[in-house]
Amino acid sequence: MQQLQNVIENAFERRAEITPANADTVTREAVNQVIALLDSGALRVAEKIDGQWVTHQWLKKAVLLSFRINDNKVMDGAETRYYDKVPMKFADYDEARFQKEGFRVVPPATVRQGAFIARNTVLMPSYVNIGAYVDEGSMVDTWATVGSCAQIGKNVHLSGGVGIGGVLEPLQANPTIIEDNCFIGARSEVVEGVIVEEGSVISMGVYLGQSTRIYDRETGEVHYGRVPAGSVVVSGNLPSKDGSYSLYCAVIVKKVDAKTRGKVGINELLRTID
């Protein structure tokens, strides 16, 4: 694996010179191998090690290099044709392979090659970009987008129109991460490498980026870039120091543990916020 990483790192240093016409065989094979390993879930761009999320930057570099070494080509879809550098993940799947891998894909959901979809996942008409990882038992609902290299945990529900930001455009240092057992409400956006920790509930229409203030009304603490585990979060505003205006924020209205989540439905958690 170290040899593979070295090839990717060296190629990335001269990426501006690489084109589909001049990409050497060693680089091309290394990039294709990484994309295949990401596609199968054998590798992932970020993983939790000793309780901390670690980003494997070289894998992200391999994803970026794949755009340098591949030319656009015509691809056939169910209702149209496509012209792109990245093949569709399911282009060569037959019924036996879908059954073996154990997830559902509702037309016209689109998944790019290099994204991993785990068992018991349901993809409604949605979009999952290259390098993303969607773990077991999750639902990607209608018109939701899972951005490049984003990490989605087990038993996560991404509601209709949710946007989970990617790392490639604009280039970000770390992927956006939604940990296990989270609920992201309709039309919410989580971007710029924000981490939503395990068991959190994000209400409809909440926007979270690195500069978004995440205000805990119980403690008065303000978080940036991280929603603490078990938080129930809604949209809000915080006043300026002189009270002349207010600016958008996200508000942690309560904390819940796994036992409470198991007994109480998501809707009830969001409705009883007083």
Swiss-Prot record:
The keyword Amino-acid biosynthesis applies. Substrate binds at R104, D141. One of its GO terms (molecular function) is nucleotidyltransferase activity. It is found in: Cytoplasm. GO terms for biological process: diaminopimelate biosynthetic process; lysine biosynthetic process via diaminopimelate. Keywords: Acyltransferase, Amino-acid biosynthesis, Cytoplasm, Diaminopimelate biosynthesis, Lysine biosynthesis, Repeat, Transferase. Its EC number is 2.3.1.117. GO terms for cellular component: cytoplasm. Pathway: Amino-acid biosynthesis; L-lysine biosynthesis via DAP pathway; LL-2,6-diaminopimelate from (S)-tetrahydrodipicolinate (succinylase route): step 1/3. This is 2,3,4,5-tetrahydropyridine-2,6-dicarboxylate N-succinyltransferase. It comes from Serratia proteamaculans (strain 568). The gene is dapD.
